[in-house]
UniProtKB/Swiss-Prot annotation:
It comes from Escherichia coli (strain K12). Its main location: membrane. Coiled coil: none annotated. Residues 23-89 form the SH3b domain. This is Uncharacterized protein YgiM.
C-alpha cells in the first residue's frame, strides 16, 4: 500500500509538471478548419473542429504532447495542437479591420485634400482680390497725379495772367499819375499868366 501510494503521488507530480495551467486568449491558425480532440494527444478521439481565426481561451498546455486545452465561444472544451494556436489574430480576421483602417485613413486623406483645395482656392481668390485692389489704387494714384499736373499747369497759367494784369494795372496807374502830374504842371505854368492879365484888364476898364 505505501508503495502504491508513493507511485500514485509520483505520477500526479509528473502530470502536474507536464501540464501547465493558464487561461489566456489564443487564436486558431488560418487553416480552413482545425480538428480538436478529447485529450492531449493524437491518439485521442476527434470531437469536432474550430474555425480558422476563431478566438479561443487557453486553459492549459501539455509539454509532453505539445497540445493545449482550449475553450471556444460556445463553451466547448477540447484539445488542439499548440502549433495551431497564435497569440495574434489571424490574417483572415484582421483583413476587415485593416480594410476599415484603410477606408478611415482614405476618408481622412480625402477630407484633408478637400480642405486643402478649398483653402488654396480661398487664398487664390483673396490674392486675386488683393491684386485687383492694388491695381485700382495704382490707377487712382496715377489719375490723381495727372489731375495734380493739370491743376499745377492751370495755377502756373493763372499766375502768369495775374502777373500780366498786375503789370498792366501798374502801368495804367503810372500813366494816369503821369498825366495828372503833367496836367498839374501845365496848369501851374499857364494859370499864373492868365490870372494877372485879367486883373490888368479889369483895372483898365475901371
Amino acid at each position: 500500500m505505501p508503495k502504491l501510494r508513493l507511485i500514485g503521488l509520483t505520477l500526479l507530480a509528473l502530470s502536474a509538471t507536464a501540464v501547465s495551467h493558464a487561461e489566456e486568449t489564443r487564436y486558431v491558425s488560418d487553416e480552413l478548419n482545425t480538428w480538436v480532440r478529447s485529450g492531449p494527444g493524437d491518439h485521442y478521439r476527434l470531437v469536432g473542429t474550430v474555425n480558422a481565426g476563431e478566438e479561443v481561451t487557453l486553459l492549459q498546455t501539455d509539454a509532453n504532447t505539445n497540445y493545449a486545452q482550449v475553450k471556444d465561444s460556445s463553451g466547448r472544451t477540447a484539445w488542439i495542437p499548440l502549433k495551431q494556436l497564435s497569440t495574434e489574430p489571424s490574417l483572415r480576421s484582421r483583413v476587415p479591420d485593416l480594410e476599415n483602417q484603410v477606408k478611415t485613413l482614405t476618408d481622412k486623406l480625402t477630407n484633408i485634400d478637400n480642405t486643402w483645395n478649398q483653402r488654396t482656392a480661398e487664398m487664390q481668390q483673396k490674392v486675386a482680390q488683393s491684386d485687383s485692389v492694388i491695381n485700382g489704387l495704382k490707377e487712382e494714384n496715377q489719375k490723381l497725379k495727372n489731375e495734380l499736373i493739370v491743376a499745377q499747369k492751370k495755377v502756373d497759367a493763372a499766375s502768369v495772367q495775374l502777373d500780366d494784369k498786375q503789370r498792366t494795372i501798374i502801368m495804367q496807374w503810372f500813366m494816369y499819375g503821369g498825366g495828372v502830374l503833367g496836367l498839374g504842371l501845365l496848369l501851374g505854368l499857364v494859370l499864373p499868366h492868365l490870372i494877372p492879365s485879367r486883373k490888368r484888364k479889369d483895372r483898365w476898364m475901371n
